[in-house]
Amino acid sequence: MARLQKLYREKIAAELKEKFGYTSSMEVPRLTKITLNMGVSEAVADKKVMDNAVADLTKIAGQKPVVTKAKKAIAGFKIREGQAIGCMVTLRGVQMYEFLDRFVTVALPRVRDFRGISGRSFDGRGNYNVGVKEQIIFPEIEYDKVDALRGLNISITTTARTDDECKALLAAFRFPFKN
């Protein structure tokens, strides 16, 4: 069992149940999945770029990502239908908690000029999205072997019904919110 998963079961769930006045323990918000998405616009010109992006995301997530393809052709972006334009990976269970632990304790402090993450990136349904500008903040990525700096989107899906519940859950996991 992952460290944050144990913390959730022993401490966080009880605190949230008391704070929001839930009658059942099944009402308490919990993490469902974490989705990592990397859009690779350079893959249109060079196919090898996609292989490097997949390798980076594999190192970060610990499992092989699926290559996402364009749903329709867009002439302005020089994209054809079915062309590889990104990669994504969905983490659940123990891997999800392990990634979250590494992200909060190791990766976020390595961001340049880090002052906390925005508390306004909630979607209104209890989910949180955060963008990372450089993949080199993760310790699994070796700086010397990176061909290009790529950003990625991290989407945290929870069972929370409101943004306040989700923010309380993530704050209990020691997310460094700005305000």
Swiss-Prot record:
Coiled-coil regions listed in the entry: none
Sorted UniProt keywords: Ribonucleoprotein, Ribosomal protein, RNA-binding, rRNA-binding, tRNA-binding
Pfam families: Ribosomal_L5, Ribosomal_L5_C
Disulphide-bridged cysteine pairs: none
GO MF terms held by the record: rRNA binding; structural constituent of ribosome; tRNA binding
Subunit structure: Part of the 50S ribosomal subunit; part of the 5S rRNA/L5/L18/L25 subcomplex. Contacts the 5S rRNA and the P site tRNA. Forms a bridge to the 30S subunit in the 70S ribosome.
The protein, known as: Large ribosomal subunit protein uL5
Organism: Delftia acidovorans (strain DSM 14801 / SPH-1)
